[in-house]
């Protein structure tokens, strides 16, 4: 299974957490910079060719007007996960632009700067029918649980005069 990750600007910084997760899960992926406004022909070529190239999920990060995610979704049947980027208006403009798509053009949307959750959601989509990937994802989520258990164990050792636990 292949996954594409697209966005403008410092793509690596914006998508680093998703990229690290995909790498950990041994899922081949690519990272590119595209703009719905500055490189519309390239966006169209990518979106219209994604399915034929074997792309199963697209992660698109965008800020401000955040049209990239919706433009890609309008040109493909491949699921698109939108990552709103905090650039102006604390990222609320991007969040609303991505989440408020017209009927028939869905974009799965994660939180502002939520590249890690976009990666996890993409892995969950790719894991449908793939037991090996499901097992990797289950182990990843179990590790998340262990981190919380460990944090609680460490907090139990912290002492304050009025702390009750």
Question: Can you say where each PLM-predicted feature lies in the sequence?
Answer:
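Acidic, glycine/proline-rich low-complexity segments that act as flexible tails and inter-domain linkers
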Residues: 29-31, 41, 64, 76, ...
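Glycine-rich phosphate-binding loop
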Residues: 46-84
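Single conserved hydrophobic/aromatic residue that forms the stacking wall/gate
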Residues: 1-12
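Active-site-proximal loop->helix
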Residues: 19, 24, 43-47, 74, ...
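N-terminal beta-loop-helix "entrance" segment that forms/cooperates
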Residues: 31-52
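C-terminal binding/interaction regions
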Residues: 10-13, 17, 92-165
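Short, ordered loop/turn segments at secondary-structure junctions
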Residues: 34-36, 63-64, 85-88, 112-113
């Amino acid at each position: 299974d292949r996954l594409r990750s697209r966005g403008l600007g410092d793509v690596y910084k914006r998508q680093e957490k998703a990229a690290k997760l995909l790498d950990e899960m041994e899922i081949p992926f690519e990272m590119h910079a595209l703009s719905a406004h500055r490189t519309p022909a390239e966006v169209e070529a990518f979106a219209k060719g994604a399915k034929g190239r074997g792309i199963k999920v697209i992660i698109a990060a965008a800020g401000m007007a955040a049209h990239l995610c919706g433009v890609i979704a309008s040109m493909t049947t491949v699921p698109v996960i939108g990552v709103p980027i905090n650039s102006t208006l604390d990222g609320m403009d991007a969040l609303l632009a991505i989440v408020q798509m017209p009927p028939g053009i869905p974009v799965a949307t994660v939180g502002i700067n939520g590249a890690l959750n976009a990666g996890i959601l993409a892995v969950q989509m790719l894991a449908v029918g793939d037991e090996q990937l499901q097992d990797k994802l289950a182990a990843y989520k179990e590790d998340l649980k262990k981190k919380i258990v460990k944090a609680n164990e460490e907090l139990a050792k912290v002492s304050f005069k009025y702390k009750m636990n």
